[in-house]
Amino acid sequence: MVLTRRIIPCLDLKDGRVVKGTNFLGLRDAGDPVELAGRYNEQGADEVVFLDITASKEKRGIIIELIQRAADQLFLPLTVGGGLRTLDDIQQILRAGADKVSLNTSAVHDPSIITKGAESFGTQCIVVAMDVRRNFTLNPEAVPVRLCDGTTCWYEVVIYGGSKPTGIDAVRWAKEAEERGAGEILLTSMETDGTKNGFDIAVTRAISEAANIPVIASGGVGTLEHFYEGFTRGKADACLAASVFHYGEMSVRDVKEYLKGKGIPVRL
């Protein structure tokens, strides 16, 4: 059986509104989250992701009411992340109507939350999100990744909304997350995020090949072809995008019809 490839709109939330920036900066308003999620539901999105991008940084919990409102109107899986630090936080989000939770900063600080979450709620509920960036300094412990121009670097995990480097190698962290019970990896490259120049194929492929769980490629979509490249060259299981959907440059259906025409299995 051929697994269908998923198209996932991502809604970055700040103060209950959808925002979008470039390279994690310059945020601008993109609309009401429930309204946008409903639109993507109608267009045939496979899932929707809500990420409260300031929750971890500002030590603020996610707005439960917003999730309840969205979950009441959606008929597709909803993943929610941002500011989830404890099992109780995870349980609250799942009870509010989310199908999965995304753990990022908290998982780096306390990797045992991945294991505890998987044991309590099932591996299918636990998505480990990684914000990564290229690092060209010498690191014998890191997994080298060859870039398109032939140079080699390693990818560093960055936390707190992309503001704090950790020294952790992204490929090794992905494998550890899998071993600890993560059901999926949500991978965002800070180099390509919001640029519309395409996914960071080098790191997407490296992590897709290293991990035995689904990898969601994120950061950089600008054209229909970029989705195709994410699946073929990047070997991702799902592709996530934000601004191209939020501002009406293309619809989820446009993407899926294009991919189907190129031989990529999708649910239409």
Curated annotation (Swiss-Prot):
Keywords: Amino-acid biosynthesis, Cytoplasm, Histidine biosynthesis, Lyase. One of its GO terms (biological process) is L-histidine biosynthetic process. It is found in: Cytoplasm. It comes from the Archaea. The keyword Metal-binding does not apply. GO terms for molecular function: imidazoleglycerol-phosphate synthase activity; lyase activity. SUPFAM superfamilies: Ribulose-phoshate binding barrel. The keyword Nucleus does not apply. Its main location: cytoplasm. GO terms for cellular component: cytoplasm. It catalyses: 5-[(5-phospho-1-deoxy-D-ribulos-1-ylimino)methylamino]-1-(5-phospho-beta-D-ribosyl)imidazole-4-carboxamide + L-glutamine = D-erythro-1-(imidazol-4-yl)glycerol 3-phosphate + 5-amino-1-(5-phospho-beta-D-ribosyl)imidazole-4-carboxamide + L-glutamate + H(+). Pathway: Amino-acid biosynthesis; L-histidine biosynthesis; L-histidine from 5-phospho-alpha-D-ribose 1-diphosphate: step 5/9. It holds the Pfam family His_biosynth. Its EC number is 4.3.2.10. InterPro entries: Aldolase_TIM, His_biosynth, HisF, IGPS_HisA/HisF, RibuloseP-bd_barrel. The active site is at D12, D131. It is an enzyme of class 4 (lyase). Belongs to the HisA/HisF family. Heterodimer of HisH and HisF. IGPS catalyzes the conversion of PRFAR and glutamine to IGP, AICAR and glutamate. The HisF subunit catalyzes the cyclization activity that produces IGP and AICAR from PRFAR using the ammonia provided by the HisH subunit. This is Imidazole glycerol phosphate synthase subunit HisF. It comes from Methanoregula boonei (strain DSM 21154 / JCM 14090 / 6A8).
